[in-house]
Amino acid sequence: MGNRVSREDFEWVYTDQPHADRRREILAKYPEIKSLMKPDPNLIWIIIMMVLTQLAAFYIVKDLDWKWVIFGAYAFGSCINHSMTLGIHEIAHNAAFGNCKAMWNRWFGMFANLPIGIPYSVSFKSYHMDHHRYLGADGVDVDIPTDFEGWFFCTAFRKFIWVILQPLFYAFRPLFINPKPITYLEVINTVAQVTFDILIYYFLGIKSLVYMLAASLLGLGLHPISGHFIAEHYMFLKGHETYSYYGPLNLLTFNVGYHNEHHDFPNIPGKSLPLVRKIAAEYYDNLPHYNSWIKVLYDFVMDDTISPYSRMKRHQKGEMVLE
């Protein structure tokens, strides 16, 4: 557990990300894929039901012993809240109401944010669009760990701690890599979320509030679903920047595992990404992919060649248009 990883820097590359070229090739060969570029109305009802489910859980846990509050937060609430963050990811791509009703998606994202307890849906949208446009770009893509993370979390034990603390790094990393001015929508998001948290505490008590926050922190840390954070872009095979996952947890995560497909076609809702793979099978079947996020987490911690430095990084060329 004390061996240092062999990597001492990111994998600097001088080529463009592969997704734009593959998207052009696939659309030229299979133009019918354009018919999948439309919102998913079912997403709206799924998100509403998830919010109502957590509201019911807040009520149930208010009188439980503390041990059951924490157990429930990890065993049940964490799955709902992590899944909700991926629902917010779908909403960030305007998958709920479509591009023509962009603001409806922003308001709905704030609604979906409520049971998570921490305001982030508006900020996430801004940074996530940069992640797609400028994948791996130094000083722009905040999905890339900081140099400190790569330098410090360099043993199996430290990488294990890094996995546990993932939600904190995702929350604070943008402030160090690519800080942006606060927008009025972020203020509204924050006011709405803080008001909701206060109401939960006032009407249901501290246990419900702790359950909500613990479900988010535990669900985004050492949790099977959190394997997607690492599986998506950490370079387990040299030269491969994005990896898909085709295991059963896609059922809980809006098919976020179909990540090559998602980066190739970010305006196609998650529910249709398996169809993209089916139509253009020759483009995806031979790409390296995963079937277990748990194994990804284990390999990340135990493999001395993998660390937070295991990301492809590039100096962005030309003028950037940031969200």
Curated annotation (Swiss-Prot):
GO biological process, one term: myelin maintenance
Gene Ontology annotations for the cellular component aspect, listed alphabetically: endoplasmic reticulum membrane; mitochondrial membrane
PTM section of the record: Myristoylation can target the enzyme to the mitochondria leading to an increase in ceramide levels.
Superkingdom of this protein's organism: Eukaryota
Alphabetical keyword list: Endoplasmic reticulum, Fatty acid biosynthesis, Fatty acid metabolism, Isomerase, Lipid biosynthesis, Lipid metabolism, Lipoprotein, Membrane, Mitochondrion, Myristate, Oxidoreductase, Phosphoprotein, Transmembrane, Transmembrane helix
Protein name, per record: Sphingolipid delta(4)-desaturase DES1
EC number: 1.14.19.17, 5.2.1.-
Lipidation (N-myristoyl glycine): 2
Placement of sequence motif Histidine box-1: 89-93
Species assigned in the record: Pongo abelii (Sumatran orangutan)
Location of this chain's protein in the cell: Mitochondrion membrane; Endoplasmic reticulum membrane
Residue positions, PTM Phosphoserine: 307
Mode of membrane association: Multi-pass membrane protein
Residue numbers covered by motif Histidine box-2: 128-132
GO MF, one example: sphingolipid delta-4 desaturase activity
Motif (Histidine box-3) on chain: 259-263
Subunit (UniProt): Interacts with RLBP1; the interaction increases synthesis of chromophore-precursors by DEGS1.
InterPro entries per the UniProt record, alphabetical: DES1/DES2 (IPR011388), FA_desaturase_dom (IPR005804), Sphingolipid_d4-desaturase_N (IPR013866)
Annotated catalysed reactions: an N-acylsphinganine + 2 Fe(II)-[cytochrome b5] + O2 + 2 H(+) = an N-acylsphing-4-enine + 2 Fe(III)-[cytochrome b5] + 2 H2O; all-trans-retinol = 11-cis-retinol; all-trans-retinol = 9-cis-retinol; all-trans-retinol = 13-cis-retinol
Function in brief: Has sphingolipid-delta-4-desaturase activity. Converts D-erythro-sphinganine to D-erythro-sphingosine (E-sphing-4-enine). Catalyzes the equilibrium isomerization of retinols.
Family: Belongs to the fatty acid desaturase type 1 family. DEGS subfamily.
Transmembrane segments: 41-61, 68-88, 107-127, 152-172, 184-204, 209-229
